[in-house]
Amino acid sequence: MADVKKQSFQDMLDYVHLYRLKNKLHRETADNDRKIRDNQKRVLLLDNLNQYINDSMTVEDIRAIIANMRDDYENRVDDYMIRNAELSKQRREIRQKMAAHKTSASEKSEK
């Protein structure tokens, strides 16, 4: 009986750990969504800025700098999207483990 209670308590601790980890990953995903949105706005800003700059006003180096900045922002957006996919995969795995915990706990309580 003591072993069953100890295992049940350990299962509960595992479940709480998984629940907290899932919430942490959810917060990270939301943070990455904000970063994606911010960097997409920066890309749009640089596109608009590039439309207003003409060769008579500035040097060609300015265009090269803007192009580099745009590429950097686009790369950041891609990196955040990849990270979000990884976080979503981890959250899905955690949800599956939590569901397995629930089913095993209900089976144990029925016995």
UniProtKB/Swiss-Prot annotation:
Localization: Cytoplasm
Spans annotated as Disordered: 92-111
Keyword Aminoacyl-tRNA synthetase (UniProt): no
Main localization (coarse): cytoplasm
Pfam family, one: DUF496
Function according to Swiss-Prot or TrEMBL: Pole-localizer protein involved in the regulation of several cellular processes.
Annotated family: Belongs to the pole-localizer TmaR family.
Protein name: Pole-localizer protein TmaR
Organism: Actinobacillus pleuropneumoniae serotype 5b (strain L20)
Taxonomic lineage of the native organism: Bacteria, Pseudomonadati, Pseudomonadota, Gammaproteobacteria, Pasteurellales
